[in-house]
Curated annotation (Swiss-Prot):
InterPro entries recorded: P-loop_NTPase, PanK, PRK/URK
Binding residues for ATP: 91-98
NCBIfam families registered for this protein in UniProt: panK_bact
EC number(s) given by UniProt: 2.7.1.33
Protein name (Swiss-Prot/TrEMBL): Pantothenate kinase
Protein family according to the UniProt entry: Belongs to the prokaryotic pantothenate kinase family.
SUPFAM superfamilies attached to this UniProt entry: P-loop containing nucleoside triphosphate hydrolases
Amino acid sequence: MTNEFLHFEKISRQTWQSLHRKTTPPLTEEELESIKSFNDQISLQDVTDIYLPLAHLIQIYKRTKEDLAFSKGIFLQRESKSQPFIIGVSGSVAVGKSTTSRLLQILLSRTFTDATVELVTTDGFLYPNQTLIEQGILNRKGFPESYNMEALLNFLDRIKNGQDVDIPVYSHEVYDIVPEEKQSVKAADFVIVEGINVFQNPQNDRLYITDFFDFSIYVDAGVDDIESWYLDRFLKMLSLAQNDPDSYYYRFTQMPIGEVEAFAHQVWTSINLTNLQNYIEPTRNRAEVILHKSKNHEIDEIYLKK
């Protein structure tokens, strides 16, 4: 065990699944298929073994937060305001953050009676491509400086205080912010915030994004496995873009497959791997729970902060 994990309890999949009584997953195989990222793999068995115990743990954290807020209200002699329970989900590109987040959204809405759950990705807080070009950092897209961190912090602050917020929308198909399009985010019972940068510090070191989170999850895997999943996803995006000239990936459908593979590998090495090693993975120990995935996408180990 490295020093990084000294304050985590390592739990095997077998032990973890025994921490929650066996119940039927509150979704169908078809629903699960519809929410998973198209290069990801997940089964109803994973839902039962990993995600139902995780939802139960989140319930414990939520109850603890509410008890503390109530006690603070008594101490301050005023009524405590209800606040959204905010969950941060981080991890590398192509590791399966989106699948985890969408699955949690369904599980929380169905295991908590009448609960409302909003899901936000931090892609919407990337600067538009034109801004990145003007600043000379288009090749740094995805790195910390390519995000409008002030806007992200402002969003979290307003949501935490029970305000509804409109945020920009990012499209992976056009590889840019969609002009004039907004996502209306309600101050729901749960707000899941997913992105590679959600545990990172903005330029203002006095305020941390993680300060806004009531629970946090890091989806982890070996670097070689993530690279393989990224390259697989890149090539699968081409099949979706074949008849869509507006897609960012369309131009690659006109290139020899060898050139496409070389380009994707170069992007992984120069951008995604560098970003992972320098900025994403170093924030891993800020999570409450680390879900480690094996080569076949199956979660084999769970690390719970002590």
